[in-house]
A protein has these predicted regions:
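Beta-strand-rich N-terminal accessory domains
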Residues: 1-97
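Non-catalytic C-terminal accessory modules of carbohydrate-active enzymes
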Residues: 59, 65-73, 78, 82-92, ...
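The feature captures the catalytic groove of carbohydrate-active enzymes
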Residues: 157-159, 163-167, 232-234, 240-247, ...
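Acidic/polar, glycine-enriched structural segments that form the non-catalytic walls/loops
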Residues: 1-24, 29-30, 38, 132, ...
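Short, solvent-exposed loop/turn and secondary-structure capping segments
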Residues: 50-54, 59-65, 91, 155-158, ...
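Aromatic-rich carbohydrate-recognition surfaces in CAZymes
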Residues: 77-106, 172, 299-324, 387-512, ...
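Active-site acid/base region of carbohydrate-active enzymes
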Residues: 118-132, 140, 201-249, 333-372, ...
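Active-site core of glycosidic bond-cleaving carbohydrate-active enzymes
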Residues: 394-425, 463-465, 472, 476, ...
Length: 760
């Protein structure tokens, strides 16, 4: 039986039965002949990853610390099967070397090796961290593969293991015995990653058989579990001749980086066999410059604190592979089986977690990390967009995207918060990044914090992000000791943020900083004076800070927060309400004013309500403007909500410059937050449909495992692997009709996912 039905529609969410699952799953199928831009990555937290393409080749690779620029796409096939001297390379991409040529090996008694064949198609179901593939060939066997990485919500140590397993299912549906060979190929690290072209190769025997390929900077192990007839050799790559003779020989290798491993098999009629390959890697040090030859500082991966080397990882996986896969299926089954969520959202909640291996990095508490850092914490960070805007912990990105970390890996989220606190400036200002491209430092630095852009930084919103993330952790854990640890930092930032425009009196609470020398999250456009989007975020920050002050008994600051709330709210409502919507901005000092609609104006409302607090705008006006947004910004996009528009239609060039958002740009994370705001106000169908159409467009365009930050702005897409999209994991709290902590309580979705993954 195949791992999943192969006759399902392409790129359409549906439910179906699948191998190992007791109930129907939710998912969508891609195909190798119409492949997505990137396949699903294999990896965990801080491990780097290797993209497994729907075409049956390796894609981008960061496992050996080619972080920026990424190595790849490698575009080499990795799996092939041979029966009767006929090899099928299991990829829809034809080999470039000697394709279509037969040849005779005179050294093997004139053995005739037939021209290699490729797969005519591949059916591909990604359900991170698992990718299931079914291959279409004319071979006398049917072949499927389940590839997976150890990613278990709630188990940070196991999810920190740099490894992947490839389970290849061979099925003989003929009436005769089929003998042959299955071969797996891996290129290993390149010279820049390894720092050498000479590798030590050590044979591995025991519960698994294969080879360890070692260098000072990068090593890996490739083995087959429980097989007696195993051969190893050099990388097969794109060499059709090498693939064609895998039944008899593999490429000679003495000290090279690449490896192939072959397992011989014999299947009686109707028989099936599963051959399991383990790939474990170990590249303990990365350079903040993004590549190992970069000019940044060196950091040591947290996984190197847990595991001694690649062989230790491989041995652990070999001994526990059945348990780990069972646990993965168990936690996924909780999501797939919860009929309170629409099918598309169940699948998206599973697959959006792929952004964690694509963007996460975790430094040990060793120099250049300061001595403020606890050994057990290290410094965990996410990279905004490794291939487009590489920088660590851009604070609004984590504001959008750290929900699954808070829920499933709070150790990592707390590590990040402690770094933000350590890097906070004496003024109370929060750091913008830990290091990276927008501030002129290398792209993977963890200890080069900066307040932001040299001109017009996002300072006015950075504090709201920081306070929100602290409140998230407090609400999720219920730990008042954590609150006490961060309270002074939160208070100092809130005071700093509310005094960025002291010359405007009460209006300064909900305005741009003095001189308008700042940017909104929706950057690259000019805003002036009172800005409802910024004001709403400020008021949400104050509400959170007030609750914290109340909890620690700081009544004086409670009164200060009450004063800010009353004054700021009065200014927003009296100065910027235009009857059907809030203005984009209004600067009383100069008379500058814009009637343009910003469809994501209610981000602060979403923040407050998600945290179980009273909203920050008048509820009746929120409802009125949500209706305005529906007939304008949402109506103008076939799949989302445009960021900016006029009350009567699209922006013209003469109206105002929206920067790279253009007249039709959509921000997927912002659209998801807007969708949840509709849910907060009782419009569940509207909100879920809006979010579904946005995610559906991402799927349609082949970006499911390569999600952008902007669609149809000044370019069809802006950004790759944007972890802001992890904001999807705030949907469970909204769907459960409660605050951010609700999914963690007994019987909540997060609670059930963690328990299933630990108990299976």
């Amino acid at each position: 039986m195949p791992l999943f039905p192969t006759d399902l529609p392409e790129r359409e969410w549906c439910q179906f039965n699948a191998e190992g699952f007791s109930r129907r799953v939710c998912g969508l199928i891609h195909r190798g002949t119409n492949a997505p831009l990137c396949g699903m990555p294999l990896g965990g937290i801080d491990t780097g990853c290797l993209d497994l393409e729907a075409t049956g080749v390796w894609g981008y690779c960061s496992m050996f610390n080619s972080l920026n620029p990424r190595r790849g796409a490698i575009n080499e096939p990795f799996l092939g099967a041979s029966v009767g001297k006929q090899t099928w390379v299991l990829s829809t991409v034809a080999l470039s070397r000697r394709e279509g040529q037969e040849w005779i090996d005179t050294m093997r008694s004139w053995a005739n090796y037939r021209a290699v064949k490729s797969a005519s198609d591949i059916h591909y179901w990604g359900h991170f961290p698992v990718a299931d593939l079914e291959y279409e060939t004319d071979a006398p066997l049917s072949i499927g593969m389940r590839a997976w990485a150890p990613f278990i919500p709630g188990d940070v140590a196991l999810t920190n293991a740099p490894a992947a397993v490839f389970e290849v299912h061979l099925r003989n549906s003929t009436e005769t015995e089929q003998k042959g060979t299955l071969a797996f190929s891996f290129p290993g690290p390149n010279e820049g990653e390894a720092g050498t072209t000479a590798f030590r190769r050590v044979k591995i025997e025991g519960a698994a058989t294969g080879v360890s390929v070692e260098s000072p900077q990068a090593s890996y192990v490739l083995t087959a579990i429980g097989e007696s007839s195993v051969r190893t050799g050099g990388c097969l790559g794109t060499d059709a001749v090498a693939w064609s003779c895998i039944e008899d020989t593999l490429p000679f290798v003495e000290a090279g980086a690449g490896t192939s491993i072959a397992v011989d098999f014999a299947l009686s009629p109707g028989a099936e066999k599963t051959i399991r390959f383990v790939l474990a890697w170990f590249a303990p040090v990365w350079n903040g410059g993004g590549i190992m030859t970069g000019k940044g500082q060196d950091y040591r991966h947290m996984y190197a604190r847990r595991y001694a080397n690649a062989r230790a990882v491989a041995e652990m996986i070999t001994g526990r592979h059945e348990e780990i896969l069972r646990r993965i299926i168990a936690w996924q089954s909780v999501l797939y089986g919860d009929e309170g969520y629409p099918v598309w959202l169940r699948d998206a909640l599973v697959n959006v977690l792929h952004l964690i291996p694509e963007t996460s990095i975790w430094a040990q508490a060793k120099p250049p990390v300061g001595d403020w850092c606890n050994e057990e914490d290290g410094v965990f960070g996410m990279n905004e967009s490794p291939r487009a805007c590489p920088q660590i912990e851009c604070i609004p990105c984590s504001f959008y995207g750290n929900f699954p970390l808070v829920y499933f890996f709070p150790e990592a989220a707390l590590s990040t918060l402690r770094a933000y606190k350590a890097y906070q400036y004496p003024s109370g200002q929060a750091p913008w990044v830990f290091g990276g491209c927008t501030v002129g430092s290398p792209p993977y630095e963890m200890a080069m914090p900066s307040p932001g852009y040299a001109k017009k930084p996002q300072t006015t919103l950075d504090g709201g992000c920081y306070v929100d993330m602290v409140d998230r952790m407090w609400r999720r854990t219920g730990d008042d000791q954590l609150l006490r640890e961060f309270y002074d930092s939160v208070k100092r930032n809130t005071i700093f943020t509310m005094n960025l425009r002291p010359g405007s009196g009460a209006a300064g609470i909900v305005s741009m900083p003095e001189g308008n020398q700042a940017q909104d999250w929706f950057e690259s456009c000019d805003l002036f004076g009172i800005v409802p989007h910024i004001g709403g975020v400020h008021l949400a920050q104050i509400r959170m800070a007030r609750r914290m002050a109340k909890a620690v008994g700081d009544e004086e600051f409670v009164r200060q927060c009450d004063s800010w709330l009353a004054q700021g709210s009065e200014v927003l409502e009296n100065e910027t309400w235009a009857g059907t919507h809030y203005l984009l901005f209004k600067e009383k000092e100069t008379g500058k004013e814009s009637d343009i609609i910003m469809s994501y104006v209610f981000d602060g409302e979403w923040m407050a309500k998600l945290h179980g607090l009273e909203g920050v705008f008048r509820p009746d006006r929120v409802k009125t403007m949500l209706e305005t947004i529906r007939r304008t910004a949402i109506a103008m996009s076939p799949f989302g909500s445009v960021v900016f528009c006029k009350p009567e239609g699209a922006l013209g060039k003469e109206d105002w410059d929206p920067g790279y958002w253009g007249a039709h740009g959509v921000h997927p994370p912002g659209t998801f937050m807007l969708a949840m705001t509709y849910l907060f106000y009782g419009e569940k169908d509207t909100g879920l449909d809006l979010a579904r159409r946005t995610m559906g467009e991402i799927v349609k365009r082949g970006w499911y495992w390569d999600v952008p930050v902007a669609i149809d702005g000044t370019a069809p897409r802006i950004g790759f692997d944007y972890y802001q999209n992890l904001v999807l994991w705030s949907f469970p709290a909204v769907m459960e009709g409660a605050d951010i902590a609700a999914p963690c309580k007994e019987g909540g979705l997060v609670d059930r996912v963690i328990k299933a993954g630990s108990e299976a």
